[in-house]
Curated annotation (Swiss-Prot):
A GO term, aspect molecular function: store-operated calcium channel activity
Keywords: Membrane, Transmembrane, Transmembrane helix
Keyword Signal carried by entry: no
Species for this entry: Gallus gallus
Name of this chain's protein: Protein orai-2
Amino acid sequence: MSSELNVPVDPSTPACCSEPGTKGMDYRDWVRRSYLELVTSNHHSVQALSWRKLYLSRAKLKASSRTSALLSGFAMVAMVEVQLEMQYKYPQMLLIAFSACTTVLVAVHLFALLISTCILPNVEAVSNIHNLNSISESPHERMHPYIELAWGFSTVLGILLFLAEVVLLCWIKFLPVDSILKNDTTTIQKPSGHAGWQAALVSTIIMVPVGLIFVVFTIHFYRSLVRHKTERHNREIEELHKLKVQLDGHDRGMQVV
């Protein structure tokens, strides 16, 4: 009868069980084993979480460096290779906007590239070591704000500036087209409404909804990602709370007995 109820006859007598979870295990040993399994699983889960953060930081740094190098190089080539029509009088604000946008675009991407270049080798050195305890040597936890800053500059602000750069480049490239009438003695500049102006306007009309879609998608993506992380953490907290309530109830039952 005592073995069926799993109540030990003598507390000093060890539990006679060859496998965990058998009927011979007394209640106190079961609680102790559950606690040890919980501590061990929490230790491994913390290490797994740290390694997951390490790999995520490494992936973000790699993506930031590649994107920033590509877009900043394109902006520099666009600035150098653009050919201005000397006979056409460009709007002053258009030239100022193009120069400012190109400069800010290159500066933002080079800053993101600088952060990625400085942090990525240290993260790569730790991630290539096949040792679970080497995670503490990685600087990704301390440098997390800088990694997120480089990621945001490269993928959000940098791409928005790149879209604006494309629009301004279309205006500078197409605006002089079919806008100058040359006679033998005079040069007359057409008003707005010619073919080049219409081409630049079409590019702007197309790019504006593209930029809005990009902003909406970015906001939706980050909200979905935050919601996923929140739900996962809530499930883990609920599981820990249920286990705590179960252990507390068993402890109270043991005290009553």
